[in-house]
């Protein structure tokens, strides 16, 4: 066999080219050349959790087709050949897979040989074979061979006979009480619990705050009330169907393996008993042939058969005096249709939800919160656990309570967090946003939603996804101290979520909780701490039985337990105060940083201004470097002082000259007047005239001095005159020194134009 040999195969009725790689088969569809991306990631030797994250972040964001039903090897996420080549190249397996990617069958040429050691049966063929085998069995009896090929639910008193059938992939097969319609392989993944009839009366409406006491239960520490999925046989792990989206079934954890007797959960040999969590993870957990039985007043669940009616499972509100109200009747009719939809095969396709289910009757509270199964689940519980967002929103508008509780105190948020449906449909963030007000609610054992998620272990993809969503979204609407309280919440046995992770040896969840504020020193009722459990300080028997021996590692034990209780209560407050101090310091530090940045910007602006001034100064002084600026400025200052002294001297000389001219002119006038009056006699009147003239002369001389000073000021302070000269020079292209000589010409020109 050549290492590059391409084979032909047929899986679930689809023709493919198959390439045998050391890690498994790599497939390419013949019809459209699409390649299974999950196979490529397997060829790159990624573990399943890593493959799931890569598919989420890098593959399903582009063109893809997800195949979950049919033959196991064919399942996975299929992408076009071009995207497959890029994906293989990114993870360095392109050269290994190139024979398959480059292979093209020439028209008219022979098809590649069939893949060896494979049976390529289509899905329809396998279904027909199962139907044939089932038809050969008498009614009410199923052979061991048939039961090994059909995964249908039966009550727990029917025992499976081991060793009668070959080992199958997936969950253990179960015997079947009655022959039912054959269903495809993809619809027979989950075990189907039998559904007992209900005897709920109007006086048994679920209370929002039921009285759950510590003495009301006798279950062992940290025992998780398992769903039908969690009740699978422990030797079966989660199904490895390529992309990790099929199932979250896992064996019971260490802390959940010890179950004490409980009257509510007790199984009898004569009566079928429902699981402790009747809500299935998919509608296929119900047999289509099993209808709902008529209502009975018996408190013991009855086995249903195919002849019972559908509507009678719904508990109807009745009274011996008054008939059912119109709201009650409308609610019962709607819930009957809703239950029919939940147990049908159409729940995976939200685009085909009947419109009548999206428009429930209004104003039907509290009837819309009627229990629809013996474990007191409401329709809202079902819708949230199924991950069907449109129905969740419709029920919410109709008045459904987000705090409805089942008989073990589980809210719809907890129910949606313990099944994988919200993960498969990617509706958990939206449903959590609707139910976020109940994130702090506890069940009958004081466990919150984080307890329930962590107990499922991190190898379950949906559990990792749910915990990431919860821890990220609660930061958007609640203060940190409440988050710390939620993460360190202790159940009735004193176990925090970190105890669960430590007991399961779940390093991923353990580290994630530590990063979000979980405390390693919290003691449970047996005195065990998460740190001691994860470090192997306690034996397995101690952890399982809730007992412990003397611990040599702990020297300072705090007794009585009230001291530890007070410490545990104070720790979140201390943490909150420290975080407030840190926030205050951070705010002050940020304020100082902003001030420093502002000062740096101011200094930078000033430096820029200084540089600009220096450049202009160098240009004005006709210099190349700033080193000589001080010398040049000193020289210019000395010249200015010298010029100012010369101006003052010239000013005095000019004043003296003007004074001398004025004195000579006055003397001339005086001499002329003196000659005219010589020889004339003067009387008293003329003497008075002379005095008046002298006074007038004095005033005129004073005015003359003022005018003289004004002339000097105009001549010496000529800054405005220089500006005018410069403005005229720029407007007429005449040199500044020639402006005075051209003033008459300019004036005449302007007068003519005016």
From Swiss-Prot:
- Protein name as annotated: Transcription factor MBP1
Identify a single GO molecular function assigned to this protein: DNA-binding transcription activator activity, RNA polymerase II-specific
Main location group: nucleus
InterPro entries assigned to the protein according to its UniProt record, in alphabetical order: Ankyrin_rpt, Ankyrin_rpt-contain_sf, HTH_APSES_sf, KilA/APSES_HTH, SWI6-like, Tscrpt_reg_HTH_APSES-type
Polar residues composition bias: which ranges? 177-187, 203-215, 290-301
**What is the annotated localization of this protein?**
Nucleus
The beginning of the lineage is: Eukaryota, Fungi, Dikarya, Ascomycota, Saccharomycotina
| Keyword field | Activator, ANK repeat, DNA-binding, Nucleus, Repeat, Transcription, Transcription regulation
Where composition is biased (Low complexity), the residues are 147-162, 273-289
Give the protein's function: Binds to MCB elements (Mlu I cell cycle box) found in the promoter of most DNA synthesis genes. Transcriptional activation by MBF has an important role in the transition from G1 to S phase. It may have a dual role in that it behaves as an activator of transcription at the G1-S boundary and as a repressor during other stages of the cell cycle.
Q: Does the keyword Cytoplasm apply?
A: no
The UniProt subunit note reads as follows: MBF contains SWI6 and MBP1.
Name a GO CC annotation attached to this entry: MBF transcription complex
């Amino acid at each position: 066999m050549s290492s590059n040999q391409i084979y032909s195969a047929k899986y679930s009725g689809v023709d493919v080219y198959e390439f045998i790689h050391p890690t498994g088969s790599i497939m390419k569809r013949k019809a459209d050349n699409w390649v299974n991306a999950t196979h490529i990631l397997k060829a790159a030797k990624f573990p399943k959790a890593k493959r799931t994250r890569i598919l989420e972040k890098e593959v399903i964001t582009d063109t893809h087709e997800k195949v979950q039903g049919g033959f196991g090897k064919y399942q996975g996420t299929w992408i076009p050949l071009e995207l497959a080549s890029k994906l293989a190249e990114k993870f360095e397996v392109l050269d290994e897979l190139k024979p398959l990617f480059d292979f093209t069958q020439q028209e008219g040429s022979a098809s590649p040989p069939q893949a060896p050691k494979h049976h390529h049966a289509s899905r329809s063929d396998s279904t027909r074979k199962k139907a044939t085998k089932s038809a050969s069995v008498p009614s009410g009896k199923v052979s061991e061979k048939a039961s090994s090929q059909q995964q249908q639910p039966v009550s727990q008193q029917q025992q499976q006979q081991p060793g009668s059938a070959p080992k199958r992939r997936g969950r253990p097969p179960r015997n079947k009480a009655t022959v039912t319609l054959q269903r495809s392989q993809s619809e027979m993944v989950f075990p189907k619990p039998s559904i007992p009839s209900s005897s709920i009366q109007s006086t048994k409406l679920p209370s929002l705050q039921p009285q759950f006491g510590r003495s009301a239960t006798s279950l062992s520490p940290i025992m998780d009330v398992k769903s039908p999925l969690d009740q699978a046989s422990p030797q079966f792990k989660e199904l490895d169907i390529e992309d990790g989206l099929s199932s979250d079934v896992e064996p019971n954890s260490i802390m959940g393996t010890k179950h004490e007797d409980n009257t509510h959960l007790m199984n009898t040999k004569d009566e079928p008993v429902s699981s402790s969590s009747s809500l299935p993870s998919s509608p296929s957990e119900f047999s289509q042939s099993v209808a709902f039985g008529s209502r009975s007043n018996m408190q013991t669940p009855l086995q249903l058969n195919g002849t019972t009616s559908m509507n009678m499972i719904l508990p109807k509100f009745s009274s011996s005096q008054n008939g059912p109200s119109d709201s009650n009747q409308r609610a019962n009719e709607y819930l009957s249709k809703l239950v029919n939809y939940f147990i049908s095969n159409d729940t995976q396709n939200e685009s085909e939800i009947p419109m009548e289910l999206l428009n429930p009757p209004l104003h039907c509270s509290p009837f819309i919160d009627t229990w629809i199964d013996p474990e007191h689940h409401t329709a809202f519980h079902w819708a949230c656990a199924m991950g069907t967002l449109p129905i969740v929103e419709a029920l919410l508008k109709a008045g459904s309570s987000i705090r409805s509780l089942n008989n073990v105190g589980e809210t719809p948020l907890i129910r949606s967090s313990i099944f994988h449906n919200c993960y498969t449909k990617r509706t958990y963030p939206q449903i959590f946003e609707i139910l976020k007000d109940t994130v702090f609610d506890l069940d009958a054992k004081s466990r919150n939603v984080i307890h329930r998620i962590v107990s499922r272990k991190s190898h379950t993809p949906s559990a990792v996804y749910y915990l990431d969503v919860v821890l990220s979204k609660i930061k958007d609407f609640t203060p940190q101290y409440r988050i710390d309280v939620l993460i360190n919440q202790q159940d009735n046995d004193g176990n925090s979520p970190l105890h669960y992770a430590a007991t399961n040896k779940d390093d991923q969840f353990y580290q994630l909780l530590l990063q979000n504020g979980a405390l390693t020193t919290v003691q449970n009722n047996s005195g065990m701490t998460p740190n001691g459990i994860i470090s192997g300080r306690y034996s397995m028997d101690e952890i399982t039985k809730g007992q412990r021996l003397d611990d040599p590692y702990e020297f300072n034990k705090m007794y009585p337990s009230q001291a530890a209780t007070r410490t545990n209560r104070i720790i979140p407050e201390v943490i909150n105060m420290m975080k407030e101090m840190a926030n205050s310091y951070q705010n002050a530090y940020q304020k100082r940083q902003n001030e420093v940045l502002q000062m740096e910007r101011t200094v930078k602006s000033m430096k820029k201004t200084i540089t600009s001034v220096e450049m202009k100064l160098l240009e004005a002084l006709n210099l190349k470097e700033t080193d000589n600026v001080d010398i040049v400025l000193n020289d210019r200052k000395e010249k200015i002082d010298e010029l100012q002294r010369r101006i003052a001297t010239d000013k005095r000389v000019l004043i003296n000259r003007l004074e001398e001219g004025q004195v000579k002119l006055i003397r001339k006038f005086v001499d002329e007047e003196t000659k005219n009056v010589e020889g004339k006699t003067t009387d008293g009147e003329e003497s008075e005239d002379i005095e008046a003239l002298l006074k007038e002369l004095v005033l005129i001389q004073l005015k003359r001095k003022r005018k003289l000073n004004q002339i000097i000021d105009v001549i010496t302070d000529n800054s405005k005159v220089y500006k005018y000269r410069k403005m005229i020079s720029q407007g007429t292209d005449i040199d500044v020194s020639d402006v005075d000589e051209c003033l008459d010409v300019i004036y005449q020109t302007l007068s003519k134009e005016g």
